[in-house]
Design a protein with these regions (language model features):
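A solvent-exposed interaction/effector surface
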Residues: 1-149
Length: 149
């Protein structure tokens, strides 16, 4: 009998810890130790995309989950953007650098907060990083869904 985890969650105390922990989690996901993209028998799960969920914010602390979601998740998030519960950010890179896309997206969120363009709700935020081979334009993309007031 095979199984698949929907998510794995860790509590993060700092940005430095976050980066180190994420590398370890991704290594465990890609090698199948944490069956999110693969089931427990190492079979790839078609139609499942990895995303980050940021929640339970408290000063510099937060919970970070890596989740495997189906396309319906993104449809629901787009509806929440239209309803005004989330602001969507989309940053891309022609060289396929997903880390750079993510960095640029988070820098824009910070700038928008400082300028007053958005007021974050700090409820639950999502990040999806997509490699160029899975996008229509052949660029790496970072999509952020930031909860707003």
């Amino acid at each position: 009998m095979s199984y698949r985890l929907n998510a794995v969650t860790i509590h993060v105390n700092s940005a430095k810890e976050y980066k180190r922990e994420m590398k370890e989690i991704w290594r465990d996901i890609t090698n199948g130790k944490l069956p999110i993209l693969f089931d427990s028998e190492h079979n790839f799960q078609q139609g499942i995309s990895p995303i980050y969920q940021y929640s339970n914010y408290a000063q510099n602390d937060f919970d970070l989950s890596v989740m495997g979601v189906a396309s319906e998740f993104f449809k629901q998030m787009e509806l929440k953007v239209i309803e005004g519960f989330y602001k969507k950010y989309d940053f891309s890179d022609t060289n396929g650098d997903m880390e750079l896309c993510s960095q640029k997206a988070w820098e824009q969120v910070k700038a928008d907060c400082i300028s007053g363009l958005i007021e974050r709700a700090y409820i639950c935020d999502y990040e999806s990083n997509v490699p160029p081979e899975y996008t229509k334009d052949g660029k790496a993309h970072c999509y952020l869904y930031i909860s707003v007031k």
